Amino acid sequence: MQQIRSALTLFNGISGLHLALDKAQIKVDKVYYSEIDKFANKVTEQHFPNDIPLGDVTKWREWDIDWTTVDLVSAGFPCQSWSVAGKQLGDKDERGMLFWTTLDIIKTVLEHNPKAKFLMENVKMKKDFEQYITYHTEQSLGKVEKILINSALVSAQNRNRYYWTNFEVTQPEDKGQVLIDILEYPMDEKFNLSDASVSRFKMYDKPKGNCVGTTKLEGRIGQRDECYGVNGKMGCLTATMYKQPPQYVVHGGAIRGRYNEDGTISQRLELNGTEKTNTLTTVQKDNVVVYNDTQYRKLTPIECERLQTVPDNWTACLSNTQRYKSLGNGWTIDVIVHILKCAYK
């Protein structure tokens, strides 16, 4: 078993790094974490009560850390200002500026321990932003390896993320997991959508490959305008029936507000054409499940945990609302496990 002295995890969330270290069978003597979300911290306190909280990442110069012992530092720095789904302000807003804070902290770690390894993560973004982050990371930290990994390789969820490291990372093997593999049985009716809600939805008839529809305005980009199935590598799936009884045809989709010809907006249930879910977000209506051809329901919190390859009930200490949010903000753990195994061969 590999062993490291201490790990520092920035923007810790629900302790994805520590969980991944455990799953990768890498022993760590001490974990420092920075996180200001009280609900995410509640999950950490339940599972890793001995981990050391540091509070606000912007106050890092006040932290009481033995920097010389930090062998690994991770940072999934906030994505809102870099994502195509956001305002794309980059480091021109407060959250985007945390990229520079991240570089300062990692640089400090490397100054005290040049052999330390780092891992930075963020969303798939426009090329200019990706190049900007890569360039300034190299200027600050030295040679950087960058890779884009889709969580669809290790889970039933499409989730493209960039990872920047100071060690080589390969693509994980495709586990071939699809939506039906992670669904809870029997179906809990409390997650069904009401008949009144379903009656308002309009489905697209002919999916175009993996994308079943769009309301994209000219010059606009981003996932919120495109409609994918939650059953393949990002879209509407017909799951293999033998894998899980009862034998439902399962589709994934999302509820989207769409413009009608008269300028009004309707809520439409849009199916994706594959066997993967859409990317988990903090918005519950971004992922729904269709089964028995007539019933529609949301993904359950446990199903969202499975999509993120987190153990069942990992977030059970939270309300369902906070579970959806924390999981949508989190990492796909098996991707991080793969990256750690590349770091500590």
Regions found by a protein language model. Name each.
Residues 1-345:
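Conserved active-site and SAM-binding loop architecture
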